[in-house]
């Protein structure tokens, strides 16, 4: 058996929509089971998202339910928006309670829907769960369990709510009193099937085990010694009883030898001295050795690592390495102690929350690979068949990369964010990110392969960004970061800028829409020119009969590459804003550099950079005078001459932005409009 999904209703930030967390699909689980080599990566569930979005809530809900901890659910665990709507309902319903109202009064509850996958020809014990199963469930090889945290006495609760409403007129005081009432009320955990039939004498703990592993568990300089001492102690006491008896016999003999030696060397001499003070019948000391198995485990085991044949003590370990080893120590402890029959008859979950603590990026990138190899080694050495699912919560882009590349898939990744004050879960899957297509099967495979590889190079930050900007060149990538930092509306948000050319950037569009992160895509008109126009550096002032080579514009322009009827300067598609050049100072720019030159052709700083970068060309254009309209009229020529020096051009501009007290050039209008849209989107105005 394995955990397929969990739906959370009204618990903390969770509401009633976009509340499903997917763990393992049948295909991934079966593929892992059929492989000879252990590889937990494809079935590892990753829960990613920024801080305070609901990642920990998912693990907490499982922990409370599995441990049947009904007392752990307090008023603060209910979604406050849900409770506010509930009290508004009471204000309307309770006055009608005695006469008009016929239906049952609603009471606060939490709900958790668990879906368990069952393997075909499985040896899993199903006697305890058959009451939850329906014919459809059997056909789908799954069962669904509905768990509700409900009031023990609804009548008393409704009576107390009525008193509360009569007593408090102030809405704020009412709500606080309502929270106190919920805290003072007793709740129970009930189980139902999907027909809402109550199932008695059932406990989810008999079906699911959860082992939470704390990632940030470094309490002292000797935490590793303590952790591994516990493991060795358990192994001796449980797995190697005969050796344990031999060790205890050795300890007893050591105590006898030491006690005899101490007695001969010290005890007799000390007692003779004491006889001078008091009779030895009244005052005498006994010195003896007291070495125990526990003392050996706690104090005599030293944890060291070897570096170039030198033993390095534990307190010189880096925190990241110590953190990783503590996690592995917990895994060893878990697998050593857990009985084989429990692994095969239950859903076994291991959760690790935010393991990236103290780890440097490279260690994070290899985290799942390291954990996978540790588990594989443990299973091989113990000859155990451990049917466990790993659940990791993280806000590290490196751990995300680790999951994608170790498992070679986007499957089983849950992106958690907040939307309208509710937790919003997005379930990722290869088939959603790059939809299947019979006609374009090969291209789909290539796109998916590209995305898995390319996302490693910083683009994984889009999962943790407030907004993202895609650009197609080094100039706009370099300069935009400066302009964003200088923008008081945007600089308070985490905005990532990615430089990906348009054709490859399109591979990300499905993912961007799925994640619903506001995305500004800055692209170029890429006006198609004939050979004469290129040779003579012809300026374009009219788009009649003109076409674009830009695949992004073509895709969202009804698959047409004609520029004649193209919407002016932008295309809006859901959470994406595609910005491109409109007419600037009488001309249409074909690139960002040309648009920047056209917008700022009179700007002193820009002219000084152009003159420095291309002195001969600049002099030929300007001649003896200072008529800057000549710069405007030769914008295409200038951008073509700069095409091999874009990085130098961008850095020279940036250097002058920072060091010179002079008017900074403006961004082109199409980019300004895009940034304005982004600001409104982030502030909830769009």
UniProtKB/Swiss-Prot annotation:
One of its GO terms (biological process) is defense response to virus. Residues 1-423 are annotated as: ATPase domain. Keywords: Antiviral defense, Endonuclease, Host-virus interaction, Hydrolase, Magnesium, Metal-binding, Nuclease. It comes from the Bacteria. This is Endonuclease GajA. InterPro entries: AAA_GajA/Old/RecF-like (IPR041685), Bact_Antivir_Def_Nuclease (IPR051396), P-loop_NTPase (IPR027417), TOPRIM_OLD (IPR034139). A divalent metal cation 1 binds at residues 472, 559. The record marks 131, 134 as: Interaction with GajB. Component of antiviral defense system Gabija type II, composed of GajA and GajB. Probably a nicking endonuclease that is strongly inhibited by physiological levels of nucleotides (NTP and dNTP). Expression of Gabija type II in B.subtilis (strain BEST7003) confers resistance to phages phi105, and SpBeta. During viral replication, when nucleotides are rapidly consumed, it is de-suppressed and degrades target DNA. PANTHER family: ATP/GTP PHOSPHATASE (PTHR43581), ATP_GTP PHOSPHATASE (PTHR43581:SF4). Residues 463-599 are annotated as: Toprim domain. The gene is gajA. ATP binds at residues 52-56. Its EC number is 3.1.-.-. Pfam families: AAA_15, OLD-like_TOPRIM.
